[in-house]
UniProtKB/Swiss-Prot annotation:
Keywords: Aminoacyl-tRNA synthetase, ATP-binding, Cytoplasm, Ligase, Nucleotide-binding, Protein biosynthesis. Gene3D superfamilies: 1.10.10.350, Glutamate-tRNA synthetase, class I, anticodon-binding domain 1, Glutamyl-trna Synthetase, Domain 2, Glutamyl-tRNA Synthetase, Domain 3, HUPs. One of its GO terms (biological process) is glutamyl-tRNA aminoacylation. GO terms for molecular function: ATP binding; glutamate-tRNA ligase activity; tRNA binding; zinc ion binding. A motif ('KMSKS' region) lies at residues 265-269. Catalyzes the attachment of glutamate to tRNA(Glu) in a two-step reaction: glutamate is first activated by ATP to form Glu-AMP and then transferred to the acceptor end of tRNA(Glu). ATP binds at K268. Belongs to the class-I aminoacyl-tRNA synthetase family. Glutamate--tRNA ligase type 1 subfamily. It comes from the Bacteria. This is Glutamate--tRNA ligase. The keyword DNA damage does not apply. It comes from Bifidobacterium longum (strain NCC 2705).
Amino acid sequence: MTDAENTKPELPKNVRVRFCPSPTGTPHVGMIRTALFNWAEARATGGTLIFRIEDTDAVRDSEESYNQILESLRWLGIDWDEGIDVGGPHGPYRQSERTAIYKDVAAKLLEAGYAYESFSTPEEIKERNLAAGRPAEFGYDGYDRNLTDEQKAAFRAEGRKPALRIKMPDEDIAFDDLIRGTIEFKAGSVPDYVIVRPNGDPLYTLTNPVDDAMMEVNVVLRGEDLLSSTPRQIVLYRYLMELGIAKEMPLFGHMPYVMGQGNKKLSKRDPESNLFNHRDNGFIREGLLNYLALLGWSIAPDRDVFSMDEMTEKFDVRDVKANPARFDIDKAISINAEHIRMLEPEDFLRRSVPYLHRDGVVSADNWDALTDREREVLTAAAPLVQPRVRLLGEVAGMVGSLLSTEGYLEPADDAKKQLKDSAGEVLDKAIAALEAVDEADWKTDNLHETLNKALVEEGGYKPRLAFGPVRVAMSGRRVSPPLFESMEIVGKPVSLARLKGLREHL
């Protein structure tokens, strides 16, 4: 395979793209990026996105995985125009329901001489390669191309059943990749390949191009790992066009690998690859989609944060970079934080509630089912917490102390380390000053003024040493919402109980 001059073709007028995952595991970020880029291209061009399922692997496919794929697309807001649950003129849209179609196409390819019966076993292919002085892994050698009827009959008499192979032409195969420019595969570099197993099961090498052809897909956007299969599909497309099954050759674009830590390809087994891990940690759809879009594409050289509406206005797959993209979880979290800050406060709270309920902080998993007090506290806390969290999973740690009516909160280990020798004396002075404040005056500004006077101006403590013990008493955490606002939300009785509780435990 060689890259020639950088030639990227024009897109067709009526773009038809597809997303066609196999239901063989939990949705991963590479799969979702593929869906995102296809969706963005369809929306940017006013084209059509087809969603179908490639479920012909009876051993690995599962209905659970199928449902997870649907769940992930719906959560992310990636919609489609034709296919699963939507219907359309080219159904069915699950390969397991299209077996008769594949058998019919395979029979036509065989009858036309584009495919042939192959009786060779893997062991025989390996032995022939070794005998000819070729590496054992050289691949299929074309042995069965010209078998006579007598030879075929003899194999059948032995009980052998043939696979079907496509005849690859003895010529260079080149195409203009939408992302990589012109790519050329030299003659002889791609052997004749199997499209139907001896047991009659059609393979991906047949089903995928046949579905694309019959669904009139004209732009194929997929991962770099499938680049090596493109010359096979180009040849098969030529044959399908000759047979009147395909209308045209689609354009191909191969998106770059997503790399993980240590510059290795991100594996499906890596936690960072698991889409639902990111959702469980508190990524919001806007933040995660924004970051996935950056794995190969950018809206502008000096801009990383954008909405999906902005993406679909600007996206062109020909702008995707061919170089591998590295999944940087820190950058992903940073971008997610930006999108959290852009949410309306009520939207932020409603999205946070399932995480709060999961972590045992509130009584229900949806906003409308919360108690009046929970809604009141969260509404007051939103402007304090929303600018400070990066993931919705962090909200519980920030608001738990505000929702709790406990008098003493056991400090976390990192919070305890912040307490200096002066903590006891600081708490004594703080308690004395705050006990003199009327509940009617228990307001943020007055609390700040009272403690600042007692601890900094009169006590002589630096602000960090003055307010640190009070913060630990109020939240039990090293990082918490703003102190005086928190004290106002919690109220005088609970605030004093917490200060006294920590003082007693020192």
